[in-house]
């Protein structure tokens, strides 16, 4: 009789826990259903009659006390069983108190179940490494430990158990399952040398102009939060839903160029990616947008003078073999527009002007360039000028602070000498006389 009771308990421990049609009453064997001696089953160890039952149920995430024992081996080898166990575990997580230890343990159990499910998947179902969609170029990420958030569904990406992609153009991150739900093209397609900023401060048009829908995904929104909260982007002035606007902060270009205001404002995800890609693009012509800004920001005047001097130094380096070998102009490789013009600025330039870093770094580069031309290189020294007005022996260069340059012939003079002589250039006068003499000589020959 004792052997039969052990045998009944053993069979109960090895019943399929996913068969919900069998209730607990159905599991109990009737006296007429006693097992015959033909079934040869191993004898349970004495003192632990119910150990296997609780461990098996615990491993599948279906036991009544999910947290009495640590996670053991997963005995289920069927994909369907694991998926059902995952659904059961998810339901348990929702029923448990928030931030409780039991809920955290259940989340760990859910991760293990999903890992087991991932191992059982067919290897032929692997995702491709590159996906191209709406001008996005998505690459499959290999990092398993970095915690990210999906830009489409606004949920956490679990790198250990989920396949996820990142766009190389705009850094858009999403689950593999969310790729086909993306409706907006990559913002990098709008970013080019001809791209422009919105230079009106928060150009709001109202929710009615958007038909009370999100400007990006067209989901219904309202200022009252029903059905979804409307969040305004300070860059575009439009309203977005909470999935497209995460209250990210960014510096607004319009507020910088008009008010010299660098306080970050809330922007949508799309605007944040666009501003991040545009931050180093030199597309702001400050003297046309707001010429009065140079009257109120002294650092901008200093930066403009340094840039003008560097442009005057550039011809020396282009014709100097030593400067080309030393690659001096590469000191400004991060700001190539500084050796092309003195008018264009990027938001990154203005940010560093505001923080006081650009003036210091540009002064160091200016000093390095001037040292090469005036002290280190004899060829560059030979290209200097002597003031033709005072005939003094010091060598002048167009980027010296005490000099003036003729706009017509580019001759260099002392500033005081040039203005004392009513800005009359002797070199231009000499060239004019030479031209006149050349025109007069053919006429004299014809008269003769």
UniProtKB/Swiss-Prot annotation:
Q: Which PANTHER family match?
A: DIFFERENTIALLY EXPRESSED IN FDCP 8 HOMOLOG (PTHR12326:SF3), PLECKSTRIN HOMOLOGY DOMAIN CONTAINING PROTEIN (PTHR12326)
Q: Using the record's annotations, give every residue carrying the modification Phosphoserine.
A: 437
GO terms in the biological process aspect are: lysosome localization; positive regulation of bone resorption; positive regulation of ruffle assembly
| A GO MF term | zinc ion binding
Query: Where are the Phorbol-ester/DAG-type Zn fingers located?
Result: 135-186, 365-425
Known role:
Positively regulates lysosome peripheral distribution and ruffled border formation in osteoclasts. Involved in bone resorption.
Q: Which UniProt keywords apply?
A: Metal-binding, Phosphoprotein, Repeat, Zinc, Zinc-finger
Annotated region (Disordered), positions in chain: 18-46
Q: Which InterPro entries does the record cross-reference, listed alphabetically?
A: C1-like_sf, DEF8, DEF8_C1, PE/DAG-bd, RH_dom
State what protein this is by name. Differentially expressed in FDCP 8
Q: Residue spans with biased composition (Basic and acidic residues)?
A: 25-37
Q: How does it assemble?
A: Interacts (via C-terminus) with PLEKHM1; this interaction is weak but increased in a RAB7A-dependent manner.
Gene3D superfamilies hit by this protein: 3.30.60.20
Which family is annotated? Belongs to the DEF8 family.
* Annotated tissue distribution: Abundantly expressed in peripheral blood leukocytes. Highly expressed in B-cells. Also present in lymph node and appendix. Down-regulated upon macrophage/granulocyte differentiation. Weakly expressed in bone marrow and spleen. Weakly or not expressed in thymus and fetal liver.
Q: Name the domain of life.
A: Eukaryota
Which CDD domains does this UniProt record tie to the protein?
A: C1_DEF8 (cd20819)
């Amino acid at each position: 009789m004792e052997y039969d009771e052990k045998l009944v308990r053993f069979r109960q421990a090895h019943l399929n826990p996913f068969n919900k049609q069998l209730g607990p009453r159905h599991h109990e064997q009737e006296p007429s259903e006693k097992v015959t001696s033909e079934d040869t089953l191993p004898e349970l160890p004495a003192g632990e009659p119910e150990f296997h039952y609780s461990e098996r149920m615990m491993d599948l995430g279906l036991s009544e006390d999910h947290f009495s024992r640590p996670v053991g081996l997963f005995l289920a080898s069927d994909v369907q069983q694991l998926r059902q166990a995952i659904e059961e575990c998810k339901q348990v997580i929702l029923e448990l108190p928030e931030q409780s230890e039991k809920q955290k343990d259940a989340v760990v159990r859910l991760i293990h179940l999903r890992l087991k499910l991932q191992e059982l998947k067919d290897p032929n179902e692997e995702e491709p490494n590159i996906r191209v969609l709406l001008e996005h170029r998505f690459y499959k990420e290999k990092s398993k430990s970095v915690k990210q958030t999906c830009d489409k569904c606004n949920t956490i990406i679990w790198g250990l158990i989920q396949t996820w992609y990142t766009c190389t153009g705009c850094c858009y991150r999403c689950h593999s399952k969310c790729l086909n739900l993306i409706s907006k093209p990559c913002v990098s397609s709008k970013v080019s040398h001809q791209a422009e900023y919105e230079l009106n401060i928060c150009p709001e048009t109202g929710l009615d102009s958007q038909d009370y829908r999100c400007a990006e995904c067209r989901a219904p929104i309202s200022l009252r939060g029903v059905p979804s909260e409307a969040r305004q982007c300070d860059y575009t002035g439009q309203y977005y839903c909470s999935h497209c606007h995460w209250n990210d902060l960014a510096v607004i270009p319009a507020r910088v160029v008009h008010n010299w205001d660098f306080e970050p404002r809330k922007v949508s995800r799309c605007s944040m990616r666009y501003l991040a890609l545009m931050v180093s693009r030199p597309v702001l012509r400050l003297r046309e947008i707001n010429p009065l800004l140079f009257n109120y920001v002294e650092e901008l005047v200093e930066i403009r003078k340094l840039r003008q001097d560097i442009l005057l130094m550039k011809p020396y380096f282009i014709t100097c073999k030593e400067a080309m070998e030393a690659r001096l102009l590469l000191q400004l490789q991060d700001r190539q527009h500084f050796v092309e013009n003195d008018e264009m600025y990027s938001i990154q330039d203005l940010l560093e002007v505001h923080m006081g870093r650009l003036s210091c770094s540009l002064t160091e580069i200016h000093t390095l360039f001037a040292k090469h031309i005036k002290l280190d290189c004899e060829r560059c020294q030979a290209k200097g000028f002597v003031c033709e007005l005072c005939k003094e022996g010091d060598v002048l260069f167009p980027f010296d602070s005490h000099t003036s340059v003729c706009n017509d012939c580019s001759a260099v003079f002392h500033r005081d000498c040039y203005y004392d002589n009513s800005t009359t250039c002797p070199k231009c006068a000499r060239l004019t006389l030479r031209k006149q003499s050349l025109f007069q000589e053919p006429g004299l020959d014809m008269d003769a």
